[in-house]
């Protein structure tokens, strides 16, 4: 599979890192970003959160060079002018955060790409897939797809375990979310969300999120049953989902823990992880699981009403699932 990465920010760089780390058969042929290639090479090599990577990487002749591997840098703002046909691109990893609806993403197809994977919640009628939850519903005819959000990738596996074992009546989710690049280091104007413009490392900032509602896109049985909000907090990486849920059938917190533990070792292996350790957020920097269930952190009010907690590295964990989905698409499009 020949892919290009459109947008070489936090997620774009970590997708490439994970592809190289696992020696994936995926071939990255180009990166399109308006930032200069030598600076992007520097940002790829040195990461303040996840450490340095590919120390041998250099910028030469407009390419990111690592030994025999060369990845071409492009800096084209107009998607319809990109040379995807000439490069024989199978999939565009759309990680700018800008082309999230079908019409905008389809411009990559007009440029010659065969498929687009949006690394964000998509707007409109775009099939959304969460690994371990509904990825097997992928149809090769789906030429524009979404990998949902990092938060949905944490919540949906947990919701599926609850749905399959106990049923879900309704639930509210809060994600206590690490700061992201869209936030300001110090107070500044944010027209759409005034609070979002306040200093990221000085405040706990309430914010909106569609992550809980998006679970209904991959688990239709839960459409209209989940919603939620976010608190942006002053940490660089790792977030946590707090799910308050009313179940359909009576059970115990211990039974929920057993169901999650079983799933983590079977159907959700490599997607979910179960821990009873006294963990904190930094313990999961670099963790590749989508959802780490914290058995010590949850509580029960009665036999149908529970608060459940799951951690996730909102960068590496999510980037890993993007690579998983790319490889699944490759294997199931032949």
From Swiss-Prot:
Name listed for the protein in its UniProt record: Glyceraldehyde-3-phosphate dehydrogenase
InterPro entries assigned to the protein according to its UniProt record, in alphabetical order: GlycerAld/Erythrose_P_DH, GlycerAld_3-P_DH_AS, GlycerAld_3-P_DH_cat, GlycerAld_3-P_DH_NAD(P)-bd, Glyceraldehyde-3-P_DH_1, NAD(P)-bd_dom_sf
Similarity comment: family membership: Belongs to the glyceraldehyde-3-phosphate dehydrogenase family.
SUPFAM superfamilies in the cross-refs: Glyceraldehyde-3-phosphate dehydrogenase-like, C-terminal domain, NAD(P)-binding Rossmann-fold domains
Pfam families per UniProt: Gp_dh_C (PF02800), Gp_dh_N (PF00044)
Keyword Cytoplasm: yes
Site description Activates thiol group during catalysis, residues in chain: 177
Catalytic activity: D-glyceraldehyde 3-phosphate + phosphate + NAD(+) = (2R)-3-phospho-glyceroyl phosphate + NADH + H(+)
Binding partners and assembly: Homotetramer.
GO MF assignments: glyceraldehyde-3-phosphate dehydrogenase (NAD+) (phosphorylating) activity; NAD binding; NADP binding
Record PANTHER family: GLYCERALDEHYDE 3-PHOSPHATE DEHYDROGENASE, GLYCERALDEHYDE-3-PHOSPHATE DEHYDROGENASE-RELATED
């Amino acid at each position: 599979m020949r892919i290009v990465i459109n947008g070489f920010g936090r997620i774009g760089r970590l997708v490439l890192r994970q592809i190289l780390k696992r020696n994936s058969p995926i071939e990255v042929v180009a990166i399109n970003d308006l930032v200069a290639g030598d600076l992007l090479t520097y940002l790829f090599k040195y990461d303040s959160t996840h450490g340095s990577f590919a120390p041998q990487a250099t910028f030469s002749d407009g390419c990111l060079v690592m030994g025999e591997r060369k990845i071409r840098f492009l800096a084209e703002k107009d998607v319809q002018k990109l040379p995807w046909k000439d490069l024989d691109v199978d999939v565009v990893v759309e990680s700018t955060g800008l082309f999230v609806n079908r019409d905008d993403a389809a411009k990559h197809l007009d440029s010659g790409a065969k498929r687009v994977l949006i690394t964000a919640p998509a707007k409109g009628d775009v099939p959304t897939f969460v690994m371990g939850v509904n990825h097997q519903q992928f149809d090769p005819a789906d030429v524009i797809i979404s990998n949902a959000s990092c938060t949905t990738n944490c919540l949906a596996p947990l919701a599926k375990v609850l749905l399959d074992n106990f049923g879900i009546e309704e639930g509210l989710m809060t994600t206590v979310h690490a700061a992201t690049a869209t936030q300001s280091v110090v107070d500044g104007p944010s027209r759409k969300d005034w609070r979002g413009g306040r200093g990221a490392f000085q405040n706990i900032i309430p914010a909106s999120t569609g992550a809980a509602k998006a679970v209904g896109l991959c688990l239709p049985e839960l459409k209209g049953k989940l919603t939620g909000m976010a608190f942006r907090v002053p940490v660089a990486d790792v977030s946590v989902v707090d799910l308050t849920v009313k179940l359909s059938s009576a059970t115990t917190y211990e039974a929920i823990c057993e169901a999650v533990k079983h799933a983590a070792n079977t159907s959700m292996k490599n997607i979910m992880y179960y821990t009873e350790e006294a963990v904190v957020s930094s313990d999961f920097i670099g963790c590749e699981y989508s959802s780490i269930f914290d058995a010590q952190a949850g509580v029960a009010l009665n036999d149908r009403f529970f608060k459940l907690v799951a951690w996730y590295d909102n960068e590496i964990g999510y980037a890993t699932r993007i690579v998983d989905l790319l490889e699944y698409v490759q294997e199931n499009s032949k």
